[in-house]
Amino acid sequence: MFDWLWSDPLIVGNEAPDFAARDDRGRFVSLREHRGKWSVVLIFYPKDETRLCTKQVCDFRDSWQSAEARETRVYGVNPDSAESHRKFSSKHDLPFPLLVDEGQRIAKLYNCNGPIVKRTVYLIGKDGRVKFARRGTPSPSVVLATAD
């Protein structure tokens, strides 16, 4: 019944699954477009405007310049609507896009799906491989230390 709680994140070193989704700004984003150019942080979080989710996303907001300096793009990911994401982003001055994960399609690819999205952070290298994968709320500095 609760097997979904115990699934592991993707294995570090493996190729990250490609995905495509719209962000809160209406732009179409895919992992493939970053390959060879940028590392990518994916912050999977359950819901906009909840206490822990807001703290986690704002921690990455506060480290955004460090991510940019490491040629790393940051994306929040959850199944909330584009409108919810726009309001959340505006309220908290988020400098990075939030992806609309309809039907938890991206979450399924990254073993984060379930009745609620499992809080997980990934860093995908410029080579398309998983460099960092951890459930919970790892510090942005720990995550970004693994960037190419």
What are these regions (language model features)?
Residues 1-148:
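Chalcogenol-based redox active-site neighborhoods
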